[in-house]
């Protein structure tokens, strides 16, 4: 099998590599809000996949949380792909996604258990916005019954260590 050269989308993923500090807010199902602080360590697995590990606490609680995010690009399907797991829940989340025309925003979509009723499934989108070489945002939204999107989590990332050149 011939090696597949990395695509521009694989190159885009590399800007997420590094050590990050994170501050965020989350709106709970009861309407209350919680703040959180965390760290993320992200590296490439070969030329194709990002492996990121977030460690912090559940917003508004003193409960440790660890999450693992994998992001890649599937050239055959012509879309971004990924998975997410987190210690607060037993579900493996599978993403598909696309990059904005201006190359600043990656939108990952998935179906996952509803925030309020775990027996139901809801549509979600997680949005990564590159704001500079050393900052980015991550927003999570759930699709409501009327088709609109409700943002329930926003996180702000600051690079705490420059990644090595790729």
Task: Locate each region found by the language model.
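Hydrophobic small-molecule pocket/channel-lining residues, especially in calycin-type beta-barrels
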Residues: 1-166
């Amino acid at each position: 099998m011939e090696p597949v050269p990395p695509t521009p989308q694989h190159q885009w993923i590399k800007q997420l590599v590094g050590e990050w500090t994170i501050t965020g807010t989350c709106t709970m199902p009861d309407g209350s809000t919680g703040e959180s602080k965390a760290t993320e360590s992200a590296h490439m697995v070969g030329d194709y996949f990002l492996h990121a590990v977030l460690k912090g606490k559940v917003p508004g609680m003193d409960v440790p949380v660890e999450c693992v995010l994998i992001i890649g690009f599937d050239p055959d399907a012509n879309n971004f792909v990924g998975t997410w797991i987190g210690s607060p829940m037993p579900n493996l989340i599978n993403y598909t996604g696309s990059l904005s025309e201006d190359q600043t925003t990656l939108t990952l979509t998935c179906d996952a258990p509803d925030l309020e009723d775990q027996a139901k499934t809801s549509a979600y989108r997680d949005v990564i916005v590159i704001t500079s070489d050393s900052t980015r945002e991550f927003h999570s939204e759930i699709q409501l019954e009327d088709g609109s999107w409700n943002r329930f989590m926003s996180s702000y990332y600051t690079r705490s260590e420059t990644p090595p050149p790729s």
